From Swiss-Prot:
This is Myrosinase 5. Hydrolyzes sinigrin and, with lower efficiency, p-nitrophenyl beta-D-glucoside. GO terms for biological process: carbohydrate metabolic process. It catalyses: a thioglucoside + H2O = a sugar + a thiol; Hydrolysis of terminal, non-reducing beta-D-glucosyl residues with release of beta-D-glucose. The active site is at 418 (nucleophile). Keywords: Disulfide bond, Glycoprotein, Glycosidase, Hydrolase, Signal. InterPro entries: Glyco_hydro_1 (IPR001360), Glyco_hydro_1_AS (IPR018120), Glyco_hydro_1_N_CS (IPR033132), Glycoside_hydrolase_SF (IPR017853). Specifically expressed in roots. It comes from Arabidopsis thaliana.
Length: 511
């Protein structure tokens, strides 16, 4: 998960975890017109109100849980060791949850939670140390993922596999700049085909990319993620051009991989393939201001439409073309046809909604400010939703974005591939406090309530994955944020304990 730090300008969040106002309104399980902001009865709410074939799962990613043992370096390894000051606790994921050694324990946690599915990712450099097929396949890495997938299947848990979750092999960064170069499209497609060949007999759900926006903006817009490039960054960069190049190349890699899967593997393997986008909703700061209404629409187009428009319509949003000009790459007619419709399903990661207000043009081109929008979580000092120690979350936005996608993007088959909230842990949180995470129960319960409402509205949603199965290394925040439904001791990762939220989710699914 990527914490929604300021992409434009945001209010600073320093309040305590979950402050709930009874005057605020959102969906409840009955989906009435006016409902309390929190779940009235978390014990009574359960999965019985969802379709029988609806999938519930939990999610993680390779870099955040596996540890670095027995794999080649990726961009995050290099970045966190070269620039430890970029992470609040100066940490890396060298050990993390040690899931490379403890994957059977991971599956036990999943089994205890009663989930039907597990969203995981493959570490590119664990199976292809040089990043490309010509550099050789690491059969030990293949064996690791075979063992994990087999363990999941043996326990009745369906694997949903993310092919790329921001961990570019460092060899490809060194050789040609990773996703800055079109050369990565072929290497990525070959890597994906290797996964189809080795795991496709058991994996029936493939996710090509995780939040391509985050890699583009944070890796190349402000340099807070690897490879740490931006205008004025030590490693160089151009914040007004490179994010658009990287986004474009990710879309091409996705589209060519989907085309390959459909032509060579889908018919006899019987799987589906899609991608996961960030799902953020935007509310006009002044609901009566036409400028703010337009700003909220622009924010959506620059955050979500940037990727969803090409995937559904084969072209970038018109407003982006008008405002970004020739800095925004063009699809050739052949590329447009390839990208258009390259989704069997849409994955959506939803965490927050924000207020949007019109902003003046930036002083210099930058993909982070090109939309000319100022974003925040507060209106006249009042938060948009529930104030947590990590961010402010707004469950009604969940329903609103799903309905907007239904109405404007042909109502695609959708899986909620991430949703959750973090607790801040600066080393001063007792174990008892960490395990009593009632705020997380409210977060999941309220979002599931709004999801149920959205489905009654006709939104084509087929699954929900909680982020996260367990506490892990949070990109850009190290170990200072804990998203897990299970607690992990990061000095001894075999020490895991079920949180109150994990117990709640297990009971929610058992009913």
């Amino acid at each position: 998960m990527a914490i929604p730090k300021a992409h434009y300008s945001l209010a600073v969040l320093v309040l305590l975890f979950v402050v709930v106002s009874s005057s605020q309104k959102v969906c409840n399980p009955e989906c009435k017109a006016k409902e309390p902001f929190h779940c009235d009865n978390t014990h009574a709410f359960n999965r019985s109100g969802f379709p029988k074939n609806f999938t519930f799962g939990a999610a993680t990613s390779a870099y955040q849980i596996e540890g670095a043992a027995h794999r080649a370096l990726n961009g995050w390894d290099y970045f966190t060791h070269r620039y430890p000051e970029k992470v609040p606790d100066r940490s890396s994921a060298d050990l993390a949850c040690d899931s490379y050694d403890l994957y059977k324990d991971d599956v036990k946690l999943l089994k205890r939670m009663n989930v039907q599915a597990y969203r995981l990712s493959i570490a590119w450099s664990r199976v292809l140390p040089k990043g490309r097929l010509t550099g050789g396949v690491d059969e030990n890495g293949i064996t690791y993922y075979n063992n994990l997938i087999n363990e999941l299947k043996a326990n009745g848990i369906e694997p949903y596999v993310t092919i790329f979750h921001w961990d570019v092999p460092q060899t490809l960064e060194d050789e040609y700049g990773g996703f800055l170069s079109t050369r990565i499209v072929e290497d990525y497609t070959n890597y994906a085909e290797l996964l189809f060949q080795r795991f496709g007999d058991r994996v029936k759900f493939w996710i090509t990319l995780n939040q391509p926006l985050s890699l583009a903006l944070k890796g190349y817009g402000n340099g807070s993620y690897p490879p740490g490039r931006c205008t004025g960054c030590e490693l160089g960069g151009d914040s007004g051009v490179e994010p658009y190049t990287v986004a474009h190349n990710q879309l091409l890699a996705h589209a060519k991989t989907v085309s390959l899967y459909r032509k060579r593997y889908q018919k006899f393997q019987g799987g589906k393939i899609g991608t996961t986008l960030i799902g953020r909703w935007f509310v006009p700061l002044n609901e009566f201001s036409e400028l703010d209404k337009a700003a909220a629409k622009r924010a959506f187009d620059f955050f979500v439409g940037w990727f969803l428009d090409p995937l559904v319509y084969g072209k970038y949003p018109t407003i982006m073309r008008e405002m970004v000009g020739d800095r925004l790459p063009e699809f050739t007619p052949e590329e447009s046809a390839l990208v258009k419709g390259s989704l069997d399903f849409l994955g959506l990661n939803y965490y927050v909604s924000q207020y949007a207000t019109d902003a003046p043009p930036p002083t210099q081109p930058n993909a982070i400010t090109d939309a000319r929008v100022t974003l925040g979580f507060y209106r006249n000092g009042s938060p948009i939703g529930v104030v947590a120690s990590s961010f402010v979350y707004y469950p009604p936005g969940f329903r609103q974005i799903l309905n907007y996608i239904k109405d404007n993007y042909k109502n695609p088959l959708t899986y909620i591939t991430e949703n959750g909230v973090a607790d801040l842990d600066l080393g001063n949180v007792t174990l008892a406090t960490a395990l009593a995470d009632n705020g997380r129960i409210q977060n999941h319960c309220s979002h599931l309530s709004c999801l149920k409402c959205a489905m009654k509205d006709g939104c084509n949603v087929a699954g929900y994955f909680a982020w996260s199965l367990m506490d892990n290394y949070e990109f850009g925040n190290g170990y200072t944020l804990r998203f897990g439904m299970n607690w992990v001791n990061f000095t001894n990762p075999a020490d895991r304990k079920e949180k109150a939220s994990g117990k709640w989710f297990s009971k929610f699914l058992a009913k």
